[in-house]
Design a protein with these regions (language model features):
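N-terminal Lys/Arg-rich, disordered targeting/topogenic segments
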Residues: 1-3
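Hydrophobic membrane-insertion alpha-helices, especially the h-region
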Residues: 6-24
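Catalytic glycan-binding domains that act on GlcNAc-containing polysaccharides
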Residues: 23-202
Length: 202
């Protein structure tokens, strides 16, 4: 009887240890994911995502893919800041905005300016193309090049949707952003309350 009790007790102890270990492992993995997929600049992202009717998770996905949240990064193609905006694109976007202030390219190092104009660009592209993936192609490769791809039957059968992305860099970029997007949606709940963005961990 006593021996049977010891066996049952041992089995229960093993189960508890396994459950605790699994829970600890799950918590550790979650913490690691949140470190890799952070939420920063909530006030700025919330304001601009709300103004341009964007999913904050997508904005964060683009920022992570473009700059890994480094404010002062400059690419070898001359793209600046968090959302990696080039000077010609920045100048063009300023003609589409109603801002009273005229900015210089150095202002793209400022998160509030970079995110504002990056969100404006995303909004324009999402309104122009039929899918998020095609809009992201244009964000990376430019609207002119995407227009050429859509006109080519080798890449688009209907002139609206790309079934093949001919540039490996752009293909990898779109895949990275969409993966980021999925993870941000899984990790966080973005809630609008009185026009203010609230971020909660799921």
């Amino acid at each position: 009887m006593r021996r049977g009790f010891k066996i049952i007790f041992s089995l229960l102890l093993v189960c508890l240890l396994l459950w605790g270990g699994k829970s600890l492992l799950s918590s550790g993995y979650r913490f690691f994911q949140e470190m890799l997929y952070p939420v920063r600049y909530e006030e700025i992202v919330g304001k601009e995502a709300n103004e341009y009717d964007l999913d904050p998770a997508l904005v964060y996905a683009v920022i992570r893919a473009e700059s890994s949240f480094r404010e002062e990064v400059v690419s070898n193609k001359g793209a600046y800041g968090l959302m990696q905006i080039t000077e010609p694109t920045f100048e063009w976007l300023q003609t589409k905005m109603q801002d009273s202030e005229t900015y210089t390219v150095e202002d793209l190092y400022r998160p509030e300016v970079n995110i504002r104009y990056g969100c404006k660009l995303l909004s324009i592209l999402l309104g122009q193309y039929s899918s998020t993936e095609t809009a992201l192609c244009a964000y990376n490769a430019g609207m002119g090049r995407v227009g050429e791809w859509l006109a080519d039957e080798a890449y688009s059968s209907d002139g609206v949707t790309l079934h093949t992305i001919p540039y490996p860099e752009t293909e990898n970029y779109v895949a990275a952003v969409m993966e980021n997007y999925s993870v941000y949606q899984d990790l966080y709940h973005f809630d609008w309350n009185g026009g203010t963005l609230h971020v909660e961990k799921k």
